[in-house]
């Protein structure tokens, strides 16, 4: 039975792609003048055996993910007209009924418990063409319906955009407790939060290694700021480099180097070293304060904050420290730059004369600025980009307590991904899931 099911899936996948799907395959082009969210129906998922609850949870999270992406108009399942018992083969599906509720796309799935965890068999259809275009068998360890749903949503996004989805990614952040600082991670939508470290000393500025195997943080274990790395494989937490008073470290896009800040006496400069903590050398030598480095996606440039002009502003220089130039000229307090993985924007936090913090983006080439938040609480800060460069996450107090919000790159859609009051700081969006 298992062999027949596997062969059937292989045959369906072969039939669905690439030749069939290439026929007038719809593509969502984000940023195009005629962009509109694609109407999609996510039918009730079928649970096999005792997987009924998991199937329901998986479908709910898939719908929420697709809404969060901003790419889809996810239709309300209460308005569906199709027979819930219809099958998965295209001839058994009454596409006209799905078209009648406005669907262009249709997602269905089977969920079951496998030998090592949950398995999901995702089926995707183009309703107007009346054809099945994608079949994918996905597995996750344990009984984690959320992880299975995130991977299904990633496959749907990949089909329609030809880009990897980001729902299976993780967010790292620092949580302040009573006398403790915790390094935590969570799903990008706020679920599955896990505590990696709990320290009696200050933790700051988490930054992911590009392969997702480690998180770099600033630790005050010794009483002074130092760079430490948390390794997922064995949960080791170790110092990196020999600099004391070092903080704000970030990996280069290829993972080979770390840019960081060192404060020595009255001098605060940027440094760079290899990822194993050796070969450190100074990048800036200026009487001003230089902090908060962030790499361009090609690794050739670094943006940073400096007060060399009299107030904190965003600057850009070569990765070797050469050719520093001022990028921002609006506002008197600009900080926490984060370079988009697409290379076209740098997100940052600005404080105005009312001491209100808001998130902005600036072009690293032209210097053109666009505002992301305005009159949404007194604090919107610490933006971090998703690996696709289309979404960002930041910290806000807009609803009376600290929350994390996911926004698109224009600020048009902003969605809280943590509920209630949470003391999370310095969110850092992790790399694509392997």
From Swiss-Prot:
Residues 1-21 form the signal peptide. Its main location: periplasm. GO terms for biological process: cell division; protein import. Residues 411-434 are annotated as: Disordered. GO terms for cellular component: periplasmic space. It holds the Pfam family PD40. It comes from the Bacteria. It is found in: Periplasm. The keyword Mitochondrion does not apply. Keywords: Cell cycle, Cell division, Periplasm, Signal. Disulfide bonds: none annotated. The Tol-Pal system is composed of five core proteins: the inner membrane proteins TolA, TolQ and TolR, the periplasmic protein TolB and the outer membrane protein Pal. They form a network linking the inner and outer membranes and the peptidoglycan layer. Part of the Tol-Pal system, which plays a role in outer membrane invagination during cell division and is important for maintaining outer membrane integrity. Belongs to the TolB family. This is Tol-Pal system protein TolB. The gene is tolB.
